[in-house]
């Protein structure tokens, strides 16, 4: 909103988060589905746009599976408490559900965010699978750990950002894999 964008639709299934969205964005459609049950076509319909029209699809799947403060791989392949009223199976796989939805939406740009721990140790395999997953659906993607304080926020918080650009858009604007990282992630 501060950058001048419009939020066309939201997917959230935790009641307290839905209530917050409704308070902050009363005119934005909210799809209260588990992302495993959501399709990109559901999202497009709620946003009242066609496949390929969306400029930016933004998603931040839960990060507890990759947080260095959590159980990490000891908690993988298990059902976890996600909120006071929700449990989720294999929370570490939700980024791939986001990619599945993104395949149907075909936004020009996709942004995903998670904890820096997704780049460390055995979680690095997930990082690589996410980058490759975007490639499998027609995007060139890069992921990088950034410190929020370097970009003007009042907190020193390390987060991993994935940016994926649809291949035809990259061609149209003259971005290629060799210069993509420096264009997307300029030095602060």
Role assignments for model-derived ranges:
Residues 1-37:
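SAM cofactor-binding core of SAM-dependent methyltransferases
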Residues 8, 54-56:
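Residue-level recognition of the N-termini of beta-strands and the immediately preceding loop/turn
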Residues 13-15, 62, 115:
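Flexible loop residues that form catalytic
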Residues 28, 60-61, 106:
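Hydrophobic alpha-helix-in-membranes signature
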Residues 33, 58-59, 112:
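Redox-cofactor binding/interface segments in oxidoreductases and associated redox assembly factors
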Residues 41-54, 64-188:
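Class I S-adenosyl-L-methionine
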């Amino acid at each position: 909103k501060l950058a001048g964008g419009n939020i066309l639709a939201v997917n959230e299934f935790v009641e307290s988060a839905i209530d917050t969205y409704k308070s902050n964005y009363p005119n934005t459609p909210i799809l209260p589905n588990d992302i495993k049950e959501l399709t990109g076509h559901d999202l497009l319909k709620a946003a009242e746009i066609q496949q390929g029209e969306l400029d930016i699809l933004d998603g931040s799947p839960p990060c507890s599976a990759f947080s260095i403060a959590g159980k990490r791989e000891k908690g993988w392949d298990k059902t976890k408490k996600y909120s006071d009223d929700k449990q989720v199976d294999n929370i570490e796989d939700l980024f791939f559900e986001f990619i599945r939805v993104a395949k149907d939406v075909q936004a020009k740009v996709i942004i995903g965010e998670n904890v820096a721990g997704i780049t460390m140790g055995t979680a690095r395999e997930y990082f690589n699978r996410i980058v490759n997953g975007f490639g499998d659906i027609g995007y060139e993607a890069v992921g990088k750990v950034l410190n929020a304080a370097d970009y003007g926020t009042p907190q020193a918080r390390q987060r991993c950002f994935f940016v994926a650009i649809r291949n035809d858009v990259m061609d149209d604007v003259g971005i290629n894999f060799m210069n993509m990282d420096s264009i997307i992630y300029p030095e602060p």
